Amino acid sequence: MQDQIILYNGPNSPFGRKTKVTALAQEVNIEEKIINVYEADFIDKHNPLRKIPTLVINQLSITDSDNICLYLDSISKNDTLFPKKNYWEIMNLTSIANGLMESVLERRMETIRSENEKSKSFINKQEIRIERTIKWIENSWNNYNNDYLTMDQIAIACALDYTIFRFNYRWKSENRKLNEWFEKFIKKNFMKTTKPYEK
């Protein structure tokens, strides 16, 4: 009997998208349920932090997008997204991409606060961090031309697309090598079918 795998996700979480892309790329069959974490108190029994994504397999709960991606990769019959020969480089770049997602998300949350509550200095700090991180990826990343798929590629693509979704397109003209790779990668079916949206 096949395990029932449920991914609790949101319509525009870059972390959730990363896990959905991983499932599609690794051909792991999952059921995705889009939820509003502010209302979904039922998920507390699976994840007391009430964060998405959260993966539930029968009675097992897996939280944190990296853990979920590792699990999905481990049960796939496809080649791993975490090859041993450059495992730590992949993990480091994935963490950098996660940090980029977090900065874009924190900037977004600050910009939608009321005018008397929002901090322009905090917003500016996040914008500087976003631009610095993308430039670092442009100059430091070595997996542009791999002929095989790895986790850092998925994470970086999701982070860059989320930057476009929540911030701006400016990085594209200022990081041409990265943008050239991104424009090709974003055309893959698992990216086209997981675009973030407002619900």
PLM features: residue spans?
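GST-like domain detector, emphasizing the conserved glutathione-binding G-site
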Residues: 1-121
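Short polybasic/polar patches that bind polyanions
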Residues: 24, 165, 187
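Secondary-structure boundary motif
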Residues: 45, 74, 139-146, 187
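Conserved residues at the C-terminal ends of beta-strands
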Residues: 58, 157, 197
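Non-transmembrane alpha-helical segments in soluble domains
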Residues: 69, 73, 91-94, 134, ...
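Generic structural signal for secondary-structure transition and capping sites
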Residues: 77, 102, 142, 190-191
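GST-like fold's C-terminal all-alpha helical module
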Residues: 97-183
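Charged phosphate-binding loop/patch that engages nucleotide di/tri-phosphates or the phosphate backbone
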Residues: 173-174, 179-199
